[in-house]
């Protein structure tokens, strides 16, 4: 017997997007001082909706401390999602600190230094 296909192939993306929007509001209401200015970058939900990886970056604050605090608050946040989402299974949340913005800033700094040293070399020649 063939596996039953989902009636809406984009449903997983829609659920992930709604989770991201709702979590943004719920995290804003958290009072934990370890959580800095967090920006949710994306959410990946497993096909059975049992787990969700939530990728975030931090503008101000410590990323690792924020990750620990968010994972500790995961049950509270999941309960908040349960009240907002109208799906049978609300996923267990796994927060992952996304270092992409840090790496991009480091790469930009390296490029700027290389360009500056090259222009100094051209001026000396």
Curated annotation (Swiss-Prot):
It is found in: Cytoplasm. GO terms for biological process: maturation of SSU-rRNA. Keywords: Cytoplasm, Ribosome biogenesis. One of its GO terms (molecular function) is ribosomal small subunit binding. One of its GO terms (cellular component) is cytosol. SUPFAM superfamilies: Ribosome-binding factor A, RbfA. InterPro entries: KH_dom-like_a/b, RbfA, RbfA_dom_sf. Its main location: cytoplasm. Gene3D superfamilies: 3.30.300.20. It comes from the Bacteria. The keyword Zinc does not apply. One of several proteins that assist in the late maturation steps of the functional core of the 30S ribosomal subunit. Associates with free 30S ribosomal subunits (but not with 30S subunits that are part of 70S ribosomes or polysomes). Required for efficient processing of 16S rRNA. May interact with the 5'-terminal helix region of 16S rRNA. Monomer. Binds 30S ribosomal subunits, but not 50S ribosomal subunits or 70S ribosomes. Belongs to the RbfA family. PANTHER family: RIBOSOME-BINDING FACTOR A, CHLOROPLASTIC-RELATED. This is Ribosome-binding factor A. It comes from Acidovorax ebreus (strain TPSY). The lineage of its organism: Bacteria, Pseudomonadati, Pseudomonadota, Betaproteobacteria, Burkholderiales.
């Amino acid at each position: 017997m063939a596996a039953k296909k989902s009636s809406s192939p984009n449903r997983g993306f829609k659920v992930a997007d709604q989770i991201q929007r709702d979590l943004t509001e719920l995290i804003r209401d958290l009072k934990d001082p370890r959580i800095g200015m967090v920006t949710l970058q994306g959410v990946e939900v497993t096909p059975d909706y049992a787990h969700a990886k939530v990728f975030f970056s931090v503008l101000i604050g410590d990323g690792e401390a924020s990750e620990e605090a968010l994972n500790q608050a995961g049950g509270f946040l999941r309960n908040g999602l349960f009240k907002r989402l109208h799906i049978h299974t609300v996923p267990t949340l796994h927060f992952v600190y996304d270092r992409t913005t840090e790496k991009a800033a480091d790469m930009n700094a390296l490029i700027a230094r290389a360009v500056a040293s090259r222009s100094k070399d051209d001026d000396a020649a």
